[in-house]
Amino acid sequence: IRQAESITDKYPTTGFKRATINNHQYDTNLRSCTVFSLFPDKSDRSIVGIESRAEKVKLNQRIVSQTSLALIDFIREYGFTITEREHWELLSYEETQKSTWHADNGAPHPCLVSMVYYLNDDYEGGEVEFKDHIGTPFKPSAGDLLIFPSSVDYVHRVLPITSGRKYAAISFCK
């Protein structure tokens, strides 16, 4: 995903909005990163170096092409029936930003499978930790794709960034 890396490297603070939790509420104690959607909507502007709706679609498709085979393998291995995959969103975590313990499936956002595609690894902190399954934080590398069930059995968090800026793309399947 070199294209996404070069875009975020060139414009690291432009166009991201505060990330929300349930019902579009802001709570920086629970989730303090910023986000922008790769969903091509009518309000598109020049954000993060993406000058047009077509460029947004192209970047989303590029991420899809680089992650689809792994998703198909996961679905087959664990027997999920997927009817929809959401467009990818890019997340940016700056120093001290984090997300606390949570499951990705819940009202008003029902989903079955969560995907996180890591775009860089030139930061410190920001490890992913699963409460009951791994027990130790996981430090992803650029290009890693983490796929897991969105259920309460996979409660997880992102530890605070201690230096640098972390970029990841996320998507959910229903």
Where are these regions (language model features)?
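Non-heme Fe(II)/2-oxoglutarate
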Residues: 1-78
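Catalytic core of non-heme Fe(II) oxygenases with the double-stranded beta-helix
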Residues: 53-174
